[in-house]
């Protein structure tokens, strides 16, 4: 039996079966990268996916360009500066290039479109950034329903075009600055206690600020009767919760999971807290009969920096999600990739608790392992790519190469 990626949660025999199916069909898997935006990202102190609210407006576009074009090309949009580290899109790009996989980028209404080939949904599905979750009216219900249906249609179409062996596996990745906060809001609205255990791109997750925004959003939504005031006691309407507190990525991704449960498509949810919220939404929307099937088909794949972060607890969060909807523990894996040793300082920042995850980095690093490649080799390849992207490290005081005409260091992040 081949070695498994590090299993965080789930039965070992289910994990082995899931990994075996992925190894067999890995070259044919589809990688879907969902870009979305929420005005929640403009709240000061909520995200490190750019050092200012204005810089976070371009994060998704710049990360998608790095993902597609690679580190040796001048990017059309400079990567926004980070407090520390380098964009997780760098890790994802190295994996995709090494495994010969080509991502499909979908723009769900970002303020800045990526200057690479991508799909951009028209309104209402792609109607710009979601409003701040504190308004309790993040998206119109018609938009949420359109995104859910679009996800279902894509999933069903993929199944119809699949070979006789069944639908090819799907990797779902995201880039949504502010998305861990909308994740916490949606989880709370669905009745999952998530305060203090949701991660984020900041060195220390802004738990108090997240909790305040979530409380304000729930109160505003209850005042509009979008989410029942007793949501923790009565089963809430998941579509209403999404409309009140969520972001476009969550809706489209949940629709894809609904189709996967119907068609039998295996899905790797490449991320941490944000993908946990997507899984919770799909479970809430499914009939009780289909929930165990989805739990067997879908797995969370994240980085070790999220999995073992002292200020969050993804495993506990997933246990609560499973218990809430009466399923066995959801499958969850952590990549073995670490950036210890003589690597670029921007990568070593991950070991200090910065950036941690985004743009599918953890899940794609797990694919690397399933392909039989070593995490040490991946770390070396990321080091080489980082030198290509931002140049060799400078002697103290730290300095960074600057994109011509931008004044911004070539860095970016997510969440």
Give the positions of each predicted feature.
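N-terminal loops that bind phosphate or other acidic moieties
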Residues: 1-173, 177-415
